[in-house]
Amino acid sequence: MAPPDSTHGGSFRDHLKTNDRSSTSKGKQRYAPLHEAIPEEISSFRSPSEYADADTDSDSDHENSGSYQLRPVDRYGSHHSSAFIPVIRDDGGVETYLDSITEAEQELLSASKQYDLFDDDDSDDLDSDEEATLRYKLKDRLKRRRARLQAWPPVKYARIWWRTLLAVIVTLAVVVWGFLSFAVSHREEPKVWPMVPSDSWFPSPKGGTLKHWEESYKKAQSLVRNMTLVEKVNITTGIGWQMGLCVGNTGLRFADHVSAFPAGITTGSTWNRELMRERGVAMGREARLKGVNVLLGPSMGPLGMMPAGGRNWEGFGSDPVLQAVAAAETIRGIQSNGVMATAKHFVMNEQEHFRQPFEWGIPTALSSNVGDRALHEVFAWPFAESIRADVASVMCSYQMVNNSHACENSKLLNGILKDELGFQGFVQSDWLAQRSGINSVLGGLDMSMPGDGLHWVDGKSLWGSELTRAVLNTSVPVERLNDMVTRIVAAWYHLGQDTWERPPPEGNGGPNFSSWTNDKVGWLHTGSNDGSYAVVNHYVDAQGTGPEAHSIIARKVAAEGTVLLKNVDRTLPLSRNASSPSGGILRVGIYGDDAGPASGPNACPDRGCNQGTLATGWGSGTVEFPYLVSPIEALESAWSTEIESTAYLRNAVMPADAVDKDLCLVFVNADSGEGYISAGGIHGDRNDLFLQKGGDTLVRTVASNCGGGQGKTVIVIHAVGPVVMESWIDLPGVHAVLLSNLPGQESGNALMDVLFGEVDASGRLPYTIGKSLEDYGPGAQVLYEPNAPVPQADFLDALYIDYRHFDRYNITPRFEFGFGLSYTTFELSDLSISPLQRKSRSPPPRPADAVAPPVYDTSLPDPASALFPTGFQPIFKYIYPYLSNLDGTAPRNYSFYPKGYNETQSPSPAGGGAGGHPALYEEMVSVKLQVSNTGDRKGQEVVQLYVSFPPDVTEEGDWVEVDSDADKTGEKQRERMKIEFPERVLRNFTKIELEPSERREVQMTLSRKDLSYWSTREQNWVMPEGKFQIWVGRSSRDLPLMGEY
């Protein structure tokens, strides 16, 4: 989710008011969201020469570039970045542009088609005459735009026109010949996706088909069948931003007396399933004590395809299996408290740039374009495991997927999530990710959050009263609304929230805190300021006490999530009784802004700045820190003997500051976050993978001068993701490197645990650290500038994410995926592989639904029953399901349904259970080995299991004509298509703790799905014939054991 911080709500509302052509300041072209921007842009279209004069602040370097400058307005009303869009100079270009903005299920010209039902000023729909008028005006504007282009003066050709013409003809012939030759000899998937909508999948499958949800759906059916129309609509639509008391994410955002746990990326670095679940338990417990029903996490999208992606740190790592295991364990932990977890963001939310149009001044969000196989094998894999973990809610993402908005993408929500993966809970939108009314209902969205439509806090919802109207006039089938409501209510019953004990203090069971004020008394509806004042904060401490204190699990996760990357001559662990090599007092230097508390952890809203020690990224995935133990504070009491320490809590130091030190501790970081915040020149996504704030220079300066070249330098990195460290990692002065990721409130304490060896260095990398950003491949680069009116991010090689790409192209990383040193040593031996079932190509036929979904009366009520009750006084900007009048409630022949709406799809053969066909999760192989601690310390080893698929796998392709004798007619046969696989893929892992000389057996299993690939032709998981190679080791490139199956 990405709402603006409450402390800046006024500024953001001011921006919304001014984000309009009629109120732009001279020389600053402002762009409103699509449904406003397109008609106005068309009506005021100017030639390129006019554009050249339009922006008095344009960069002179671009005066003749054929581009004009868009200046996006951010939430604070300031200009942080510019996007250059090519000017359309010919009629064909205009036609192409207009075609592009009218595709994608009628999304991009939604002002004339989609929002006629859902974008009103006074809760009134446009009647049919107004609709016709709007469409007529729009078409007229388009005609006038083309006419102006055709009226441009013709180009005066030079006298050498014939030479130019000849050159053009020759060039075209060469290009055509080359293209045809390439097409014949190189039959592959196209390297760009055409800008066409995603496949359609209708109707939206009904919930209540799985046995373990049966009781919950029965209870829900009993309740829903007695609800009125407006009561049903009320459940599906949020009440509006800041209209309630709370908003929550990873932890409890904007709440008092809650814990700031280590980030997801730190949790993934533990590779410890038990800790993953314990962290989830603690998070769910705090939500329960604060009266929160739904926790908006965990995040498993972004997956980390782009190492510079701004929100990667909220997830658990750049591998679908690691991400899936951590997400599933977190969900089980959260929901063990009766709190609903939310699997987000479904799906392909891999970058922050252009995720929302109003954040970047573009017509609509970018499209993440991905193939069916990569979608299943990489990006949807964690969501499938989350559904197997019984997650109650899934959040759809901001951007488009294959040019259809994720929150109305019927293929994703209906076809994959609800049918194939058997999701029984409800789909909620990310905050303001809903971009249409009817299409989102039919496309599979069940709950609109926070209820606002296209703008924050404007009181206009795409659903609310407009959904009531759409059901009454039959634009939306009432049975679809019934399923939406039933899914939500069934999830409430499924988590036992109907029997919740009311959280302290005794009250109505709702939130006992306000996200919008720290005062005891405050507004009940902050977004309205309607005068409703009450006690809103009861200051309930949810952090636990004594042995149940959540700080304990936070510290454990932070410590086990710390990765030891380098350790020359056992520099670490440090001794608490250390002395100088000369026998005197140890002289310690502490360097870097990242070591200190600076202005405190909550100095910037939503942690939207990089100051002091970095303990979390920024954005809606953060919390208000109850405290933060910085490294410098923890170091003050770290030694048991007297030492001489000097702190330089800045990143600019002189060589002389290090020459007299025996030990130099350098603290550096790299930060990023959600796209609605820009900090330090970073607009959500990182600009590169280097350390920030001069960190690389700081490391080189200290490491080259510590002790005059005789001292030892230890580097501690706090980072949101991979950091390129080539400029200093091999310096002889760099003796040890610790990657502490984002450790949360117990940062300093957890670091001391590892630094001084109280716990083993047992973290392992959840991603690959390359030697440059380019090492990750062209498909892993953030799209920083729009490449089309609707930015297109093509995930052409998404099957080869992270270490898979390095393996594919034999690129040597600095530190591979899964890498991490320990303070002891381990040996893996005695691998044995045992089949548990016979191989078979495909799962058996899809099982029938275990339970029939609820059935309701679909008759419509009297429209008058949906009017505001007599004498009712609405709260300003609060979202209601009631109608203010009966306009547009008569049944109508609605004709703007998305493409494919009238085509019923067949159930997926890969479905039939939670997470997919039950047979996919049957164990096929047992893998056993012995693990021995061969060192002199207790330690933990992460045993990682990888699979290589058989070579030369093929499947039937298209029909092709085969050569035949001259006297015979031609014949056709299916060609065989070669199926490519990554060199190896992670499929299982476990973490084991051993005493010195201890030896223990480890057993892991592989499921059918682990040994299958997604066949785009068969639309099912297929286990290929041939021998699989099964690798076991310590990282993706340290795999001493291999066997075959």
Swiss-Prot record:
This protein's pathway: Glycan metabolism; cellulose degradation
InterPro entries noted in UniProt: Cellulose_deg_GH3, Fn3-like, Glyco_hydro_3_C, Glyco_hydro_3_C_sf, Glyco_hydro_3_N, Glyco_hydro_3_N_sf, Glycoside_hydrolase_SF, Ig-like_fold
Membrane topology of this protein: Single-pass type II membrane protein
Signal sequence bounds: none
Positions of region (Disordered): 1-74
Residues that carry a glycan: N226, N234, N402, N473, N512, N577, N893, N902, N988
EC number(s) stated in the UniProt entry for this protein: 3.2.1.21
Chain ranges on the Extracellular side, renumbered to this chain: 185-1045
Residue intervals annotated with topology Cytoplasmic: 1-163
Keywords: Carbohydrate metabolism, Cell membrane, Cellulose degradation, Glycoprotein, Glycosidase, Hydrolase, Membrane, Polysaccharide degradation, Signal-anchor, Transmembrane, Transmembrane helix
One GO cellular component, as annotated: plasma membrane
A GO BP entry: cellulose catabolic process
GO molecular function annotation: beta-glucosidase activity
Glycoprotein among keywords: yes
Family from the record: Belongs to the glycosyl hydrolase 3 family.
Reported function: Beta-glucosidases are one of a number of cellulolytic enzymes involved in the degradation of cellulosic biomass. Catalyzes the last step releasing glucose from the inhibitory cellobiose.
Protein known as: Probable beta-glucosidase E
Annotated source species: Neosartorya fischeri (strain ATCC 1020 / DSM 3700 / CBS 544.65 / FGSC A1164 / JCM 1740 / NRRL 181 / WB 181)
Recorded name of the encoding gene: bglE
